[in-house]
Amino acid sequence: MKTNFHTHTYRCGHAVGTERDYVAAAAQAGCELLGMSDHTPWPVPGVGMQAGELGDYVAELKQLRGEYAGKLELKIGLECEYWAENMNWLRDQIAEHGIDYIIMGSHFGNVRGERAYFGAVTDRDGLRSYLDHTVAGLETGMYSYLAHPELCLRAYPQWDKAAEDTCRQLARACRDLNVPVEYNLEGLRANRKGNHPGLGYPYRRFWDIAAEEGCIAAIGYDAHMPETLLDDTDFEMARRLIENELGMKRIETIF
């Protein structure tokens, strides 16, 4: 692993370890460029840091950036949802805190007029809502890549025309907008453990389509434990799949 841009901390409420723990693990693993990207503290309820934590998160990472200068390059990022009514707020936070980048994690949106988790959708309406919501977010031009692009397949029960159409339209949008798609290693670990109730993600047919449509790929550890960064087995498997089997262009860095 030379680079990783999908890294969480305890602040999001569903990961363990401090910023220092992850940076130390990355340095031990020989990482050259690490991006920290914990979940944004939105002004609406959801998964993410608590309100007021963003300043501490950034301050700690700036301290670590100085400590590890010459050993590891550290970028300060966030994994962000897309909430149309709050994007000006997000732009202000990025400017105020000097955030280097954001990646899109499209977890939540509206399905049939109600807020829903896209990783739990099981019907065509859910797939369509995920597609429309995610593409609208990407069209803002704010996101450096799309994390776990096929999250909508996590609980979806079968590969059918609706699933294929959704994946193809999403892949085409990412290609046309020049937004890389992430092969998500946290999802891969969950697949292995049987933790996805449906097709799951990463899902091979999505990646076949992404290759056919000319998407650019990234690999993200989506680390929720520092020790995840110490094992490159899944990274190497993903790299071989993307580069050798699928013949896709893979980026090492978003900078």
Q: Could you tell me what each predicted segment is?
A:
Residues R91-I94, I99, H196:
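Aromatic- and acidic-residue-enriched segments that line the glycan-binding/catalytic groove
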Residues G30-E32, G98, M142-Y145, G247-R250:
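Short loop/turn motifs at secondary-structure junctions
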Residues M1-A84, W89, E96, W159-L170, ...:
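An N-terminally biased module of ancient metal coordination in phosphate/nucleic-acid-related enzymes
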Residues A27, A95, L138-E139, A211:
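Non-catalytic positions within long, well-ordered alpha-helices that form the structural scaffold/packing
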Residues V16, W42, Y101-K193:
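Divalent metal-binding pocket/active-site signature
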Residues M1-T9, E19, M142, L153-R154, ...:
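Charged catalytic cores and adjacent phosphate/nucleic-acid-binding surfaces used
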Residues V47-A51, Y117-T122, H196-P197:
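Short glycine-enriched, charge-decorated loop/helix-capping segments at active-site entrances
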